[in-house]
């Protein structure tokens, strides 16, 4: 992940200014107040230990009035492995710029994840799995996350494992429908399922 000198950051939004001035000290405050993150630097400040994983890099063609143009499309996941995760997509004619755009979008899309011990086979009360069965969808792909007891691990495809690990999920069973070979939709379906753990009304 490229290093940004946050001391040189000039916030463009009211939320950004509040974060830089220390009026908002945790990312939890942002979501508790339903505020919208429009600057990735906010995430850099409030989640300094954020990790990044490149999920996919493809060469895609874009039709323009001048003909076809090749671009790189990057899919990136970010997370702190402790209840926050984001997924983003970026396109550019340069690989590095595509990855940077995807990383920026992933930070802007970051969401809290509600974790727990939702399996009836386990009663440890530790946040190692999801607290209940939850689903997410993107395109033709639908992913269902099922609470698993401690020690099961991540029973999921490779792309899903990365997103789940970055969110801080250690044990889960998954069910999938649709074309999971499409990395973008697969990653977004898992991300949407994780996001639904937070917004689901108990």
UniProtKB/Swiss-Prot annotation:
A GO BP entry:
translation
UniProt xrefs under InterPro entries: Ribosomal_Su5_D2-typ_SF, Ribosomal_uS5, Ribosomal_uS5_arc, Ribosomal_uS5_C, Ribosomal_uS5_euk/arc, Ribosomal_uS5_N, Ribosomal_uS5_N_CS, Ribsml_uS5_D2-typ_fold_subgr
Presence of the UniProt keyword Zinc-finger in the record: no
| Entry coiled-coil feature ranges | none
Which Gene Ontology CC terms are recorded? cytosolic small ribosomal subunit
Keywords associated with the record: Ribonucleoprotein, Ribosomal protein, RNA-binding, rRNA-binding
Q: Where is the S5 DRBM domain?
A: 50-113
Would you say which domain of life the source belongs to?
Archaea
The GO terms this record gives for MF are:
rRNA binding; structural constituent of ribosome
The UniProt function text for this chain reads: With S4 and S12 plays an important role in translational accuracy.
Tell me the domain comment: The N-terminal domain interacts with the head of the 30S subunit; the C-terminal domain interacts with the body and contacts protein S4. The interaction surface between S4 and S5 is involved in control of translational fidelity.
What does the subunit section of this Swiss-Prot or TrEMBL entry state? Part of the 30S ribosomal subunit. Contacts protein S4.
Which family would the database say this protein is a member of? Belongs to the universal ribosomal protein uS5 family.
Provide the protein name.
Small ribosomal subunit protein uS5
